Amino acid sequence: MTYEAEMEQIVSTALTLQDDYIKFTPRNQNMACHAEIIGIFHDIHPTVEIKEPHQDKSVLQETLVELYSVLGIPQEPQVSKTMKFEEPEQHKESSSTVTRSDSLVNSLQSTGLKRPFCEDEHREYKKPLIQAEDISPATSTRSRKRTIYSKEQTNFLQNQFDLNPYPDFVNRCRIAKITGIPEPRIQVWFQNRRARHLPRATTFHSPQGRKSPTSEGPRSFLSREAHYPDEWGQAPNPSNTQPYPN
């Protein structure tokens, strides 16, 4: 017998067996169990019509319940088999935080109240405000700063004040060049000196009825200024002495 003939015989035998046993071959384990139960039920109650299993799960479940009740088999309450996936703890915490924040926002929107401060925000809120003295220390120190004059500078300024308590800009610049003091400082010094001494000096009269030297006016001081010896070693030349213009 050739190889092809053997293959044809095997195939025909397999087809014959499949045609003979197709009705008795269960599709799966559940179908085999169901067929066994139906066979037992048919032996006990041959008059009951057995329906073919329906594809619908609900109909199949009702059929099984009816079958169990007839057989007297106690049934346990069926629990719905739902897959419960356990979420990671981190995901649970984040979801709970989001839920709390959403509920807080909704409650605040409904009530119209201000939200409470968090711990970090509360700590920042408790910090003291910057004082005004810390913001501008330069201005306060600048306003309190005083110019310290040397003894020679003070004597020279006092002598110039005795000669003319109202020096103009040209005279102040000359005094600044001699003493090395800025002209604005010299102007302030003369203003302070006039505020302290001039009111008393103008109202003062000697017992003989003569006025004080300061009441003679600025013109007399200009004529006397040329004959005053220079404190800084630069005596003016008498031949070139002229009164300074006002």
UniProtKB/Swiss-Prot annotation:
Residues with site note (Determines DNA-binding specificity): 191
Entries under SMART domains matching the protein: HOX (SM00389)
Function field: Essential for Wnt/beta-catenin-mediated formation of the Spemann organizer and for induction of the organizer precursor, the Nieuwkoop center. Acts as a transcriptional activator, cooperating with TGFbeta signals to induce a program of organizer-specific gene expression and to generate an organizer with both head- and trunk-inducing activity. Activates the head organizer gene cer1 by acting synergistically with otx2 and mix-A/mix.1 through the 5'-TAATCT-3' element of the cer1 promoter. Also binds as a complex with lhx1/lim1 and mix-A/mix.1 to the 3x 5'-TAAT-3' element of the cer1 promoter.
Descriptive protein name: Homeobox protein siamois
Record field: compositional bias (Polar residues): 95-107, 203-217, 236-246
Gene Ontology terms: cellular component: nucleus; transcription regulator complex
DNA-binding as UniProt keyword: yes
Record GO biological process: cell differentiation; mesoderm formation; nervous system development; positive regulation of DNA-templated transcription; positive regulation of transcription by RNA polymerase II; regulation of transcription by RNA polymerase II; Spemann organizer formation at the dorsal lip of the blastopore; Wnt signaling pathway
Main location: nucleus
Annotated InterPro entries: HD, Homeobox_regulator, Homeodomain-like_sf
Record has Ribosomal protein as a keyword: no
